Amino acid sequence: DAQESRGLGDVYKRQFLIADRKTLTPILWEEGANRTWGELPGAGEHALDAAASPRFPKRRWRGAGTAIPVFSLRTEEDFGVGEFYDLKRLIDWAAATGQCVIQVLPINDTTMTGTWEDSYPYNANSTFALHPQFIRLPAAGVVEDDEYRTLRNELNALPEIDYERVNRHKLRLLRRAFERHGTRTAARRDYKDFIAANRHWLIPYAAFCTLRDETGTPDFTRWGGFARYDRKTVDAYCRSHNRDIAFHCYVQYHLHTQLSEVCAYARAHGIVLKGDLPIGISRTSVDAWLYPHLFHMDSQAGAPPDAFSAVGQNWGFPTYNWERMARDGYAWWRARMAKMAEYFDAFRIDHILGFFRIWEIPTHAVHGLLGYFNPALPYSADELRGMGFDTQDGRYTTPAPDEHMLGELFGDLAGEVRATCMKEGRLLPAYATQRKVAARFPGDDEHQTRLREGLMALLDDVLFIEDPRRKGYFHPRIAPHSTHAYRRLDGERRAAFDRLYTDFFYHRHNRFWQESALRKLPVLLSATEMLTCGEDLGMIPDSVPETMHELQILSLEIQRMPKTPGELFADPAHYPYFSVCTTSTHDMNPLRAWWEEDRELTARFYHEALGIGGDVPYFCE
C-alpha cells in the first residue's frame, strides 16, 4: 500500500498481475524484476504509469484429448458394440480429467455384404449415412423384452465384437420397431425436417441399401437396369419399395437424433468432438453410383512402398476427378463437409497428401509399385529420348526376363514359367497383368503362391510406366534400384536414370503440387468452421508443410514415427505449435501394448527418450 510505504526509506515496488474478478486471487504474475516508483501519490491521489507494459509470459494454449473408435467403448447399455450414447460417459471422464478433445474413427455406414469384412471403417457405402451399429436400440423404439435382454447380455459378455451377429440382430430388431413406430414417427415435424434437409443423399442411400439386399451385392454394375443411376428409374423403384425405403430413413433419423444429442452434450461440457475424413470412397458406394463422373473408376488409390510394405499399398478406392469436381465449385465436397460439421467441431484429413497428389494405380495392377502420382508432370517420350531412354521398343516399360532373372524369381519352377507363361522372352497376354495373374493362380498352396508372387514381381520389373490418360508420357517407376531392369543398365545410363529419377520425385513437382492443393483445400476449409488437422505422414514433399502452415492446418506428429531422418523417437519439445502430437496412430499398438512388444526398443525409449535410468518396468503402468 502506498500510504503504508511512506517514510520507510524504500522505493515503492510493484508488479502487474491477473486476478480473479470476484475473489481477487492472483492467477498470473508478470515476469521480470519488480518495478520501482520513487515518488508516491498523496492521500486520495492516484498515479498512472502510461508507459508501462505488462510482461506476462506468452502462454500458448495446449489441450489434451483421447482418440478411440466408438465401437471400442463399453457400457452395460450396449448391444455388443460401442454406441453413440456411450460417448456421454467418455465426455464426462474427459471433462473431469481436464481434457478437451475426443477423436473418433469414421462413423459412416460400411454395410456391404453383412459379414465381418464390412467392419473396416474406411470403406463406407455412403459418405453421409451413419452406421446402424452405433444406434441405441431402446431409444429407437426397440422393446427391452426378455429376448432383447438375453441377447444384450450375451453379446456384451463376448471378449471381442461379433460384428456379424451384432449387426444382424440390431437390424432385425430395428425392423420390428419400425413396423410398430414407423408410421407415427413419419408424422413428426422433426422427422419431416430431417428428410427434407437430407433428401439429396438419404433417398439414394435407402435405394442403394434396398437394391444391395435384393440383389445380394453392393456392386451396382451387376444391378442390370439400375447399374447406371437414373433418378426417374430410381424414384419409381422407391415408390414400389416404399416400406424398405422408409425403414432405412427411419434408422438414419434415429442415428442422427442420437448423435446430435451427444454432440450438444459435448459442447455443453466444453469437449470438442473430432471426426475423421477418409481420403477415399468405396467403388461400390452410393457416391460412386450417383456421381461416377467425379471419380476415376479405372484407377485405384494407394501408397508407394515404405518400411512397412515393400510393394506399396493398394487401397482399392477410385481416385478423384478433380477437374470435373471443380466445374461445380466442389459441390460434393462442400455438402460432405457441411454434413460432418453437424456433428464435429474438428476433423482429421486422412492422408492429406491426397489433396496435393494421390498415388494412383491402374486397376489391372495389384502392387503399389506400379503406381504413379496424379496429378503429375510425366516425361514425354522426346524428353526421355534426349536423356538416353528410347521407350518405343518397350524394353523399359515391359518386363524382359533373362534366364538369371527367371531362376532368381522362380527357382526350380523357372522351366514351367518359360513353357506355360512366356513366348519369345515375353509374357503371354493371359499373364500380362497382375490381376490376370491373381485370377490364374488364386490358390494358397505353395506351388500357386510361388507362381503368383513370382509373376507379380516379374511384372513389377520395369523402369517407366506410361500415363494411362496421356499416351507417350511416362512416369519413372518408384523404388527401381533393386530391379533387374535397373541393374542391366550400363554405368552411363544408370547415372542418367538416377538424375531424372531424383529430379522427378524430389524437385519437378514441388510448386506444381502446392498449386494443386491450393485450388482444393481452401474450398473445403471455407465450407465449415471446423478446426482442420492433417495426417501428413509418409513421403512428404517440401511444399506440404508450407501449405499446411499457410492454411492453418495442424500437422500430425507421432513419437514412434519421427519425421527427421535418423531419429528413433521424435522429441515433442521440437514439434511445431500447430500440431496434434501422439505416441501412435490407430494403425499401431497403443502405448501399453507396444511397451511389451520389443524389450530392447522399450529400454531405449525408457532411457533415451524419457531420460530415466535404472531397470525398465516390465509393464507400462
Identify the role of each PLM range.
Residues 25, 33-621:
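Catalytic cores of glycan-processing enzymes that make or break glycosidic bonds
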Residues 4, 31-32:
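Intrinsic disorder/low-complexity segments enriched in polar/small residues
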Residues 19-31:
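Short acidic/polar inter-strand loop motif in beta-rich domains
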Residues 2-12:
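Short, small-residue-biased leader/transition segments that mark boundaries at the very start
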Residues 13-19:
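Short, aromatic- and glycine-rich surface loops/edge beta-strands on solvent-exposed regions
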